[in-house]
Each structure stands twice: as C-alpha cells, then as structure tokens.
C-alpha cells in the first residue's frame, strides 16, 4: 500500500485531512527507525462548539471524548495496516500525558507532526489550525518506519494581528505570541489546566474548556 492509499483509508473512515512527514529526530527511545509520522484529524461539530459559553458545555465534553475515541480507533487501525505491510507502527493517542515528567504532552506532539505534514499551522492560542477547518479539529499521529513525504510545504502562520483567543481566555493562559521554532509553548498549559480544574469540575472534572476554539475567527462557525 502507498502513502496515498493509507491517507485515503483515513479519509474514508472519518478523518477530514491526512498527511505524512519525516521527523527531525526519532521520538521513541531505542526505536530510531520510527522517524516518520502519519498525521490526521477529525472535525468538531459547529453546533456543539456554539454551545460553549463562559465555559464548556456537557455536550462539548462528550463530543470531545467521542472525537478522541474515533481518532484512537483510526490510529489503531492504521497501525495494523502498516504492520500488515511489514512496517513498524506506534499509534500516539489523541489525548495522552507522560505522567509527572510530562503531564501536558504525549509521546510526540500531534501539532508538530501536522505542521511538518503541511496540514496547517500552530496559532497564538497554541492550537493547531488546519487549512480548511481552523482550530475546530482534533488530531492523532502514528509513528512509523514507512518513508513518508508531505503533500504540501509547511504553511506560514495565519493569525496576523488577531488576539481573539488572548482576550477570551478566562485563565489568562495565552501569551498572544507566535510559537517558536524550537517548540517552546506560547501558552501556559499549567495555568490552563489549573483554571479548568478549579472552575469546571462539574463538566468532565475540569478536563476541557473550548473557549479559545469557539472564538477563533478562522473556524467560521455556522
């Protein structure tokens, strides 16, 4: 199967975009051959995002979990297809932490893989913005040793002078700066998480918010 075959599989099963890239450095210790990544995403519902007000809605929390479950299923199935073709594959969960050592990050940043695959850019909010759907997406990644190349070049940041997310963030966690090339965060993940846990315990035990997604003008909610 070719890269296009596998990307077409993802698109046929619910992803709205998919791509691939070579990573600058292999992310898995002891597995240097896993230096390529499939990146793909699913779109969140406009109507559900509009239900977010001064905090997350119950509908958004459930929708968020359902999107993650779909992504994890797609990543698992893609990994199976890759292994059937004789490649190694390491699915990275849609939402995953690495314990106390890295409580706000997974095995490899989905946003980095998506940007390197030419699928979009990381905005001032720290969110990934896809070319067609803005930040109203969720991402997953599968690391592999199958050689992959981007279908499009890396996209320039498209935020311009907009700071809608900065003004709307109730935690004050968004700096309003563009992300750096060395991967330094342009928002305070700890402050974001702390605010959610303190103020949104009744919705998913403070695990989601979504305000920065709702207010982003790139999303053009219908």
What are these regions (language model features)?
Residues 26, 67, 71-222:
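Catalytic cores of enzyme domains
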Residues 1-68, 73:
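Non-catalytic, usually N-terminal nucleic-acid engagement modules in DNA/RNA processing proteins
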């Amino acid at each position: 199967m070719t890269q296009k075959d596998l990307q077409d599989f993802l698109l046929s099963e619910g992803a709205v975009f998919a791509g691939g890239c070579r990573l600058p450095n292999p992310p898995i210790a002891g597995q240097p051959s896993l230096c390529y990544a499939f990146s793909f995403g699913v779109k969140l519902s406009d109507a559900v995002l509009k239900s977010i007000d001064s905090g997350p809605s119950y509908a958004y929390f459930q929708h968020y979990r359902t999107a993650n479950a779909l992504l994890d299923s797609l990543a698992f199935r893609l990994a199976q297809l890759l292994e059937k073709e004789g490649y190694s594959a390491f699915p990275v969960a849609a939402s995953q932490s690495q314990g106390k050592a890295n409580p706000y990050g997974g095995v490899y940043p989905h946003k980095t893989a998506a940007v390197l695959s030419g699928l979009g850019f990381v905005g001032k909010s720290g969110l990934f913005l896809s070319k067609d759907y803005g930040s109203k997406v969720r991402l997953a990644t599968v690391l592999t040793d199958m050689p992959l190349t981007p279908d499009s070049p890396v996209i320039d940041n498209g935020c311009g002078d907009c700071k809608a997310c900065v003004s709307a963030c109730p935690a004050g966690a968004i700096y309003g700066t563009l992300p750096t090339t060395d991967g330094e965060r342009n928002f305070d993940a700890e402050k974001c998480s702390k605010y959610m846990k303190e103020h949104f315990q009744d919705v998913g035990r403070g695990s989601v918010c979504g305000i920065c997604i709702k207010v982003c003008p790139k999303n053009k909610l219908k």
